[in-house]
């Protein structure tokens, strides 16, 4: 089966993400993790950019083994010299040089004619071969370049010693169909392509970076350039984890393989997110917090019976602990019962039904239902009295004068009372309940605690009252402490 080479540019293009600036030690730490991930090439940086960048590339070249260590350089001799110096200690090194080839770049940025651009490209590759036998050449903005001119340039740099020719979709302009045709055209029309790798480098401006990369692989690309979590300039680059997992899961379709250690994907994603400060969106494919989470009752029931009903990837294969059953307002009894079993509870059907009803009521008001929330619901259910007194409706307003309206059923008989006090909504509520019951009770203790954190957290209220010399204790649980108090 044909192998696709993975060229990781997290430390170069990925670090160009606005707001990201990694220290030398942080870059080395990421590079070592990329080596554990077993990528083929690590683009460590752009040595001419700064002294810190040079030191980072040099340190990675010295300390990181196994992958080829690459450094970027413009088609300028001083850039290439700096890259060659930084890579001197690498076990395997590569100089990656580039120049723009699109009409708009040649006219407005370079202010050079196509023939002059081609000569500069050849000169750069020839100079790079003085430092290494492994030279990659990129035709910047290839997808907006003339295809025949691309063929001319690539043939010339291959003759000059390039071992890899890269086809960048620099501004994320291509569509999968166009990019497939371009790569196939280059494969068929570059006369000296034999023995030379075709690489692709896709940006995500139209959200097509991964799709374009996969299309290029189908068209015969040998190498794909990616970043962890898809970070990078503007909208980012093709996401390493998405490309690799797609090739693995759909090997039947793409008919290629990589040497990447899938077990390290989760750890690599978390490390890059932590060190760059770029949080992974919850709905991000493969590595997002919700990628293997299920809230829908139908989906939860299916996954609990057979994981593959709603999961095409085993999260454990990627280094995650497993699937997540997220309890929320869409969850069903099967998932709720399963969660109780995980927490060590075994309820009767009657208790389960009441607890599930309480759970659904809370889930309608609370975004996230945590294990602590579930335990609080169960504790309330297990300690609840089966008395004949029930608070049906509560309405409380607060201001200079607080008022409370309650509807209480006792032995099937409804009683409604209204009270208002200046001392606040809780005082008004207790007075209304007092009047509705026709009993004079004294409040001996009132305590509110938060079960979980957050603005929609569950509040647990403990009330201790004295009636005719007897002490009664009640507990309430709700996202509304007024309701919990009743």
UniProtKB/Swiss-Prot annotation:
Region feature (Regulatory domain): 390-486
UniProt subcellular location: Cytoplasm
Residues where Mn(2+) binds: 13, 201, 203, 237
Domain Pyruvate carboxyltransferase per the UniProt entry, residue ranges: 4-266
Biological processes annotated in GO: L-leucine biosynthetic process
Known pathway: Amino-acid biosynthesis; L-leucine biosynthesis; L-leucine from 3-methyl-2-oxobutanoate: step 1/4
Xref: SMART domains: LeuA_dimer
InterPro entries referenced in this protein's UniProt entry, alphabetically: 2-IPM_HCS-like, 2-isopropylmalate_synth_dimer, AIPM/Hcit_synth_CS, Aldolase_TIM, LeuA/HCS_post-cat, LeuA_allosteric_dom_sf, LeuA_bact_synth, PYR_CT
GO MF, one annotated term: acetyl-CoA C-acetyltransferase activity
GO cellular component: cytoplasm
Keyword rRNA processing recorded: no
Family of this protein: Belongs to the alpha-IPM synthase/homocitrate synthase family. LeuA type 1 subfamily.
Protein role: Catalyzes the condensation of the acetyl group of acetyl-CoA with 3-methyl-2-oxobutanoate (2-ketoisovalerate) to form 3-carboxy-3-hydroxy-4-methylpentanoate (2-isopropylmalate).
Protein name in the entry: 2-isopropylmalate synthase
């Amino acid at each position: 089966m044909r192998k696709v080479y993975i060229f990781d540019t997290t430390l170069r293009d990925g670090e160009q993400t606005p707001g990201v600036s990694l220290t030398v030690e942080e870059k080395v730490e990421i590079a070592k993790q990329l080596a554990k991930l077993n990528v083929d090439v690590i683009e460590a940086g752009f040595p001419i950019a700064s002294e810190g960048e040079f030191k980072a590339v040099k340190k990675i070249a010295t300390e990181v083994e196994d992958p080829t260590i690459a450094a970027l350089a413009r088609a300028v001799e001083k850039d290439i010299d700096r890259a060659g110096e930084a890579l001197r200690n690498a076990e395997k090194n590569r100089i990656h040089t580039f120049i723009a080839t699109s009409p708009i770049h040649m006219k407005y940025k370079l202010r050079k004619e196509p023939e002059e651009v081609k000569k500069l490209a050849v000169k750069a590759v020839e100079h790079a071969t003085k430092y290494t036998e492994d030279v990659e050449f990129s035709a910047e903005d290839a997808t907006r370049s003339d295809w025949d001119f691309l063929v001319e340039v690539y043939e010339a740099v291959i003759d000059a010693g390039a071992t890899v020719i890269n086809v960048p979709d620099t501004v994320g302009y291509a569509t999968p169909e166009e990019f497939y045709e371009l790569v196939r055209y280059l494969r068929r029309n570059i006369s000296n392509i034999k023995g030379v790798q075709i690489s692709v480098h896709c940006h995500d401006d139209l959200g097509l970076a991964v799709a374009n990369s996969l299309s290029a692989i189908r068209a015969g690309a040998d190498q794909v350039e990616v970043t962890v979590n898809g970070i990078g300039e503007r909208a980012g680059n093709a996401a390493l984890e998405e490309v690799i997992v797609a090739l693995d899961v759909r090997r039947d379709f793409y008919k290629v393989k990589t040497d990447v250690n899938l077990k390290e994907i989760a750890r690599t994603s978390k490390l890059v997110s932590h060190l760059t400060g770029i949080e992974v969106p919850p709905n991000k494919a493969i590595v997002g917090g919700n990628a293997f989470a299920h809230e829908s009752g139908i989906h939860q029931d299916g996954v609990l019976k057979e994981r593959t009903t709603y999961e095409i990837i085993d999260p454990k294969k990627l280094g995650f602990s497993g699937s997540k059953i997220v309890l929320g307002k869409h969850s069903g009894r099967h998932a709720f019962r399963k969660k109780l079993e995980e927490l060590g509870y075994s309820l009767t059907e009657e208790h389960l039904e009441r607890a599930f009803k309480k759970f659904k009521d809370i889930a309608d008001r609370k975004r996230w239902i945590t294990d602590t929330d579930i335990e609080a619901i169960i504790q309330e259910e297990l300690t609840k009295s089966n008395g004949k007194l029930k608070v049906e409706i509560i309405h409380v307003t607060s201001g200079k004068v607080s008022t409370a309206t309650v509807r209480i059923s006792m032995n099937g008989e409804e009683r409604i009372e209204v009270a208002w006090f200046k001392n606040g909504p809780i005082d008004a509520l207790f007075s209304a309940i007092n009047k509705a019951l026709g009993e004079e009770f004294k409040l001996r203790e009132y305590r509110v605690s938060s079960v979980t954190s957050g603005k929609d957290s569950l509040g647990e209220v403990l009330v201790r009252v004295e009636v005719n010399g007897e002490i009664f204790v009640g507990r309430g649980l709700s996202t509304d402490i007024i309701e919990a108090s009743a």
